[in-house]
């Protein structure tokens, strides 16, 4: 046992915590929320903080995720830093504004065979301020088959004009801790918790043309950005390529049609890579990147916003 260990954050008054745990876990217990999407396994690299003193040696788990400059300035993965001695750290000021929200499940809607839309009504506090494109971390409690609390990151999909509820679009991951909880255990009326908001994914404040590219639950942040464009009466030219393997992977066509009506310079182009006979699909086929090439001039100065599987993003 290491007894009590002091953590000094941004040179403020030290906080005292029980030693032996990870820095990430200790900060979370004290309601200081650092982004993390892998349950503290050291695989997402979201939980970076600058350790000025007392972090101990950098572990082999961390080094693949840290650039030479980050290693030089003391950046660490907070989930891999064990609290064994007094530690002094520096975190971005905006993370100190992140807080925890108690919410209630208001609705659950099937979008496809493996994607659902969850609406969470805020209870305490009753409002959330966020920038369109940001995400929250949903808490998964223990349940049969899962004996640990974990957080998972999900982008906000809903209209930022309503700050009293948020929608998350969640795709079922086979054996995924959080998605199994959401799909098999979470019911309308249940209480839940998340923290946030986080993230730098947002629309630039330029007049450049926009290319959105997404697939699956990557729809969420793009939908939020489209709501924002409609709310601000944006006149920017935008085209949205949404990819799926088959017709059954496509959803929200009516919502996209409404955005096309409300945004005079917006086009929605769904793309199916492998349409099946009998689907009656008459739209774009093949890889999303190929559809982009067909519709966007090669020398376009458009800004691209991508959200989807690593394979789709690499191809685009």
Model-derived regions: residue spans:
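A short, basic/flexible loop-to-alpha-helix module at the beginning of a structural domain
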Residues: 195-208
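Short, conserved phosphate/pyrophosphate- and ester-handling motifs at nucleotide-, phospho-/glycolipid
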Residues: 133, 218, 309
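Reductase modules of NAD(P)H-dependent flavoproteins
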Residues: 1-43, 49-73, 237-316
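Ferredoxin-reductase
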Residues: 100-190, 244-246, 271-275
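Fe-S ferredoxin-like electron-transfer domains
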Residues: 1, 64-121, 126
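Residue-level marker of beta-strand positions
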Residues: 46, 86-88, 135, 190-191
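Histidine-anchored nucleotide/phosphate-binding helix
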Residues: 221-231
